[in-house]
């Protein structure tokens, strides 16, 4: 099924939608524990001309995503799978190995060099405390 939503850009609204997608991805990953983690999936980065945000299943089928979809996927797997989603070299890996949290409170964040109230190029990242 395809659902298109057209919005006037607002940073807070974009973050709410991306974090909603991360939560949906977490639900999918909990319901289907055999799904591969993002770094094991073969999915790669590809810049999009039009923004299409896929859930985890559609991202796997498509085989690629840009930073927004990849960030929502990564946040979703940290939320769903906790410490087992971290790999050596990831921030907080050693601490997560010791604490073994079942869930990590991950969220999608936006970074930009644009001035306030002047949308420009944004990049999505994942932030998570341990």
Place the predicted regions along the sequence by residue.
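A structural boundary/capping signal
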Residues: 1-130
């Amino acid at each position: 099924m395809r659902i298109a939503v057209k919005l006037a850009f607002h940073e807070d609204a974009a973050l709410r939608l991306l974090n909603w997608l991360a939560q949906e991805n977490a639900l999918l990953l909990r319901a289907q524990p055999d799904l591969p983690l993002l770094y094991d999936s073969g999915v790669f980065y590809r810049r999009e001309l039009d923004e299409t945000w896929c859930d985890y299943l559609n991202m796997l089928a498509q085989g690629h995503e840009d930073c927004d979809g990849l960030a929502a996927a990564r946040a979703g797997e940290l939320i769903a799978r906790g410490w087992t989603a971290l790999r050596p070299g990831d921030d907080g890996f050693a601490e997560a190995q010791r604490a073994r949290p079942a869930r990590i409170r991950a969220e999608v964040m936006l970074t930009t060099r644009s001035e306030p109230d002047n949308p420009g190029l944004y990049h999505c990242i994942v932030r998570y405390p341990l």
